[in-house]
A protein has these predicted regions:
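The conserved 3'-phosphoadenosine-5'-phosphosulfate
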Residues: 21-46, 132-217, 221
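PAPS-dependent sulfotransferase catalytic domain
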Residues: 1-139, 208-251
């Protein structure tokens, strides 16, 4: 599901790999010509498949990873409290998306394509799809705040590398919110997806807020009641079943 912290983790892991291999930082991801860095495909996969307006791409499964590759390769899944995701997605849909959303946040929460129910469907699909697979790392956005060292170390080990604690520390420091915002202001490391839509509007930045549990500032009580009802269908593995307004200050 988008807005779950993938870009943050992507920068963190990419920085580690650049240090580990002594290569220039590249957050682009998959590159068939690379002979040094591990080839990592960053994708929203099922979500992109559901959201594409191209009937041809949907029929061809353009965004879907073949099952053979999925079973053969290590997988990392970044997930986040759907309530926080919905708030972040709303600002993205209003400020950054090529298909700008014209409705209210309450309408987005209930939207069939990208609302709460769609998120639950995608998250459940991934849990079922990866059931029984041993080389999977589930990365909770909140834990990227609370224990980034442990998660990045686990990710590096999953890639078959011997983690270097100093490089882990440097990569985490590099990917902190303030530096990510500065990088975005400076051109997003040459990548359009890490560039602000409008530099004068903080809500249009890819790195917008970076907090855990801030959804209460934007979602009305009736929205939270609706989301809670939808989350009853979410696999309890994720732990997002009850509305608890958490500390909204960055870690």
């Amino acid at each position: 599901v988008p807005k779950s912290g993938r870009t943050w983790f992507r920068v963190m892991l990419s920085k580690y790999l650049s240090l580990h291999f002594g290569e220039q930082l590249d957050i682009g991801g998959y590159d068939e010509t690379s002979t040094v860095l591990p080839n990592i495909l960053y994708s929203h996969e099922i979500w992109s498949h559901r959201m594409t307006s191209s009937v041809r791409r949907r029929l061809l499964g353009f965004y879907i990873c073949p099952e053979s590759a999925l079973l053969d390769k290590p997988v990392m899944v970044v997930h986040r409290d759907p309530r926080d995701v919905l708030v972040s997605l709303y600002f993205h849909a209003r400020k950054r998306s090529r298909r700008l959303f014209q409705g209210s946040i309450a309408e987005l929460v209930r939207d069939k394509e990208r609302g709460a129910a769609a998120m639950v469907a995608v998250m459940n699909a991934w849990r079922e799809r990866l059931s029984g697979k041993s080389d999977v790392l589930w990365i909770a956005y909140a834990e990227l705040h609370s224990r980034p060292e442990a998660l990045l170390t686990a990710a590096v080990a999953l890639l078959g590398l011997d983690p270097n604690p100093e490089f882990v520390h440097q990569a985490i420091d590099f990917s902190r919110f303030d530096n990510m915002r500065k990088l975005e202001n400076q051109g997003g490391l040459g990548k359009g997806f890490l560039s602000p839509r409008n530099a004068a509007d903080p809500e249009s930045f890819k790195v917008r807020s970076g907090v855990v549990g801030g959804y209460g500032k934007h979602l009305a009580a009736e929205d939270l009641i609706y989301i809670d009802r939808v989350l009853q269908d979410l696999d309890p593995f994720f732990g997002y079943s009850v509305s608890v307004e958490r500390d909204s200050s960055p870690s």
